[in-house]
Amino acid sequence: MELIHESVGKKLYRDGDRLIKSFDESYSKAGILNEALNQARVEETGLNIPKVLGVTVVDGRWSLIWEYIEGETLESLMQMHPEKEDEYLDFFVDLQIRMSEERVPLLGHLRDKMHMKISSSAYPATVRYDLHMRLDGLPRHNKLCHGDFQPSNVVITPDGTPYIIDWSHAT
């Protein structure tokens, strides 16, 4: 296994055609399993995303196993080719629009997630009430929301196919 990325609490390894995302003890088992479940549910849309291959414990750490997608992130391509930034941004926006056309009814709802965050905030009760009322006044829909959609979460394969990664915050 080759370590290819490390961030606070997480390590990414490449093992042939598999990617292993290993979490430290600061991540809850429920959160890790939820990330795998989110990704499995989004797989059913037909969007290009890495397939979930398994959830396991490796060296005492919970780990998710996905198919490895060969390519560069859109963020890397933007840095390597600044003259193409407008083209890449148009591509990124088109991908966002395509993603928002999908429906994944088994995912949690963003509205519920925001209500929980408001309720658990330290704001005074009157501010929390106002935020809840404003949230309830927004239009209701069931569009797929990635939750962390940014150029670093889009991998472009050598043939130009985009794959969207990191579905831990999807609703």
Residue ranges and their predicted role:
Residues 2-32:
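ATP-binding glycine-rich loop module of kinase domains
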Residues 51-62:
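Short beta-strand micro-motifs within the conserved protein kinase catalytic domain, predominantly
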Residues 29-45:
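The N-lobe alphaC helix and its flanking beta3-alphaC-beta4 segment of protein kinase-like domains
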Residues 101-147, 157-159:
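An alpha-helical support segment within catalytic cores of ATP-dependent transferases
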Residues 60-73:
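Conserved short submotifs of the Hanks-type protein kinase catalytic core
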Residues 157-171:
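Active-site Asp-x-Gly
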Residues 75-110, 128, 134:
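Conserved kinase catalytic-core helix
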